[in-house]
Structure formats: C-alpha cells, structure tokens
Amino acid sequence: MDIILGVVMFTLIVLALVLVILFAKSKLVPTGDITISVNDDPSLAIVTQPGGKLLSALAGAGVFVSSACGGGGSCGQCRVKVKSGGGDILPTELDHITKGEAREGERLACQVAMKTDMDIELPEEIFGVKKWECTVISNDNKATFIKELKLQIPDGESVPFRAGGYIQIEAPAHHVKYADYDIPEEYREDWEKFNLFRYESKVNEETIRAYSMANYPEEHGIIMLNVRIATPPPNNPDVPPGIMSSYIWSLKEGDKCTISGPFGEFFAKDTDAEMVFVGGGAGMAPMRSHIFDQLKRLHSKRKMSFWYGARSKREMFYVEDFDMLQAENDNFVWHCALSDPLPEDNWDGYTGFIHNVLYENYLRDHEAPEDCEYYMCGPPMMNAAVIGMLKDLGVEDENILLDDFGG
C-alpha cells in the first residue's frame, strides 16, 4: 500500500509541476501573430510568429540583412534601428554598438528576440538585396591555399553591386573530406608537408558567410570570389577547419550554390586624391575589383598604385591582369613583395613585408602621404602593420579604408 501511495504522490507532484510550467509559459511566452512595422510603411509590414530572432524573421520575409557570421553576434554587421518592441540591448551587442548608438535604438538583428509587436527602421538599400541560385563555372587554385570561385548568375538576372562590395554565400549541412580535393601538383608540396589532407569538415546545419567580390561591375553575369582555405593553425592542429571555406573548396563545375546580396561599404571615395591599394592573401579580391573599376569602367586619371604582399612567387596571381593595366594606364603602377621567396623563384623584385616595402620604396619620400587615400585588405597582422605605419606618417582615419575580413 505504501508503494502505491508513493507512486500516486509522485505522479501528482509531476502533474502539478507540469501545470505550473504550462501556466508560466502561457504568461511569459506570447502567442498569436506579431507585427513588425518597417520604415513606417504599411506595405513593408511583416506578420510572423513570436519566438526566434529578428534576423531570421526578416530573411523569412525576403529582407536580407548582412550577417557575415551567420547570426552568431560576432561580426556586428546586422545592424537595424529598433524604435519599439525590441527589449533591452544585450551585452553581446555592446561589443559592436556604443552606448550612444544604443540610446538611438541601434541593435543587432541576430540578437533581438521576437516577443511582441515591433517597430524598426532599415536602410533603403537593404530592399535591393536578393537571393540567387548560381551555377559553378570553375573553382581553380590561384595559389597554394587560395581558390578562385567563379559563379554564373541565372539568365536574365544581375547583381547590381559596386566595386568593393560583397555577397553572402550559403553552405548547407555537409561532410567534406580534404582528401577529395583536387590540388594541382605545383601546390601539393605544402599540403603534404602540413598533412592537410587528413582534415574533414562535418557540419549539421546551414552556414552563411560573407566574401568580397573580385570581379568588377562590368564583368556581367558572374560572381568571382577569392577563397582562402581556413585550416587549423599549426600550434593547434586539432581544432576544426573552417566551415565555409571547406565547403567552397569542395564545389565543382556545374554544382549549385546560393548567394545573396549585394552588400558593402568598402567603396571608393569620389575625389581626385591619389589612391594607394595594399593587399595580401585573399585580400586580393576587393583590390582587383576596385582597380579594374577605376581603370576599365570609370577610366579614372587619378594617380594610383597597388602594393601586394605574397610569401613566394607561387602565391602571386592575377599578375597578367595587373601587368596589362599598368601597360595601358600611365597613372597606374603595381608592385609585389615576397616575404619568403624560394630559390627557384629567381626573384629580383622587392622582398620583405609589404608595409615596410611600401614605406621604404615610396611613402618615406612622398611629399604628402597624408593626402593619399589608402585602400587595404589582407590578413589581420598585415592590416595592423600598415595602419600603424600610416598613423606614424600622420594619415587621418578618414583616409584609411579597410575591408576587414578577419583573416
């Protein structure tokens, strides 16, 4: 009898707890539809279910806000202005938003929970962002760890981007084995040296990342990206490799790939100032886009130079492109510096790190380096070194433009 009574009491306690939870849920979790008012325009209003994040609700309604980290709160790009209904700003957002901006309603859409009706404000250019399913034209190695992914836009469509802009690319859940990569013989030495073929990328959910475009607006119907494979660092070889780069490197001719865009803010200023471009690694992409746009589309007569840093001759690419532009335009010159040239390179050009080469061979004797505009994109250490050098020369922040892809 005691056992039966104990079972009955336990069951009653469990039922009571369930009822308490259900009651609390009914009070704390909103039910029914909620409305997101956008830019005070009734035609843009979004009706959705509560729960989830604002970024996802906007995407579900076909409004694609830039989010290079895929909604993780780390990139700080998905800024919107929440005028009401967003709740208190979270500590994760304050890493990217100042207290003053927070008072004005600035929020990260990926961190705003959908609990009640909301009134938000979005930049008008957001409504020009679209999504396309593209076809892979080619995906070739341009350097040991860099591929050029070339995508075909669907017939009759176009991506109305500006030079220096970027798109977001989607990777589905996947299992990629590096051993299946087709690495050309000239690049295999380092892959085998660092035992990279042992890696695999196993991902169970969709991922979104941002990449700057290497093509310029008059290269119609295509999107070109320079993608560096994100392998684990040598001092920590057991961490997982990069999700998106692993997926992109697995793509083959004819495969389908979903992108959205265009996005961007790394645009050239409309001035007559001298332009100095500084790049390294996959930071080549926006450099190529900008320089081609200035010289081929705009026929700019501004004085400009391009300084690119590579490890060895094997890591140089688009050489023929820039040689052609230099031959055709008296106002453009370009230089490459190798930090670790190989004996077989027979290199007689600049050597060392690109910030030192730029300073020693040009800016040190420049009559007014502070008057130039500097456009740069490369690995974080390169960016920091170049910016430090420019600051020492008295260059103001407004003349230093950085496409900071974080690596």
From Swiss-Prot:
Classification via CDD domains: NADH_quinone_reductase
Keywords associated with the record: 2Fe-2S, Cell inner membrane, Cell membrane, FAD, Flavoprotein, Ion transport, Iron, Iron-sulfur, Membrane, Metal-binding, NAD, Sodium, Sodium transport, Translocase, Transmembrane, Transmembrane helix, Transport, Ubiquinone
Signal peptide: none
The keyword Nucleotidyltransferase appears for this protein: no
Comment on bound cofactor: Binds 1 [2Fe-2S] cluster.
Post-translation changes: The N-terminus is blocked.
Subcellular localization(s) per the UniProt record: Cell inner membrane
GO cellular component assignments: plasma membrane
HAMAP family in alphabetical order: NqrF
Protein name per the record: Na(+)-translocating NADH-quinone reductase subunit F
Organism of provenance: Vibrio alginolyticus
